[in-house]
């Protein structure tokens, strides 16, 4: 839970995602409904004009103690990705798989899907 909260604090402050991805990269489905995205170990490149998103109701299921876990939570707020449309009520369900590498939890998979009454991101690619 703390890794997720820390990642969102970084996102909101720096207006870009923290590089918390596995050394093997990750696969993601984004809330825009597009195709699967391959994320390189260097992380997601997008930046935001503004972003204020927070995780809520985080639940973690341990798959292998100290090695792998799945987190499920909601992500809510607003954002304006650079070169994309504003999302005034971003509200998604999130499922993420984490692996422990060099003592740190790293993202291996993510699936973001909009919740009824909210919207997903307007981004459809990694540009």
PLM features: what roles do these ranges have?
Residues 1-20, 119-127:
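Short, low-complexity N-terminal intrinsically disordered segments enriched in polar/charged residues
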Residues 4-8, 39-42, 95:
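Extracytoplasmic/secreted envelope proteins and their assembly/folding machinery
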Residues 18-54:
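Short solvent-exposed beta->alpha transition segments
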Residues 18-31, 68-79, 97:
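Short, well-ordered beta-strand segments in beta-rich or mixed alpha/beta enzyme
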Residues 40-86:
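Surface-exposed, charged secondary-structure patches
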Residues 56-64, 112-116, 125:
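Glycine-rich beta-strand-turn "strand-cap" elements at beta-sheet edges
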Residues 82-88, 117-123:
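A short acidic/glycine-rich loop-to-helix N-cap element
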Residues 91-120:
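Short beta-strand edge/turn micro-motifs at domain boundaries
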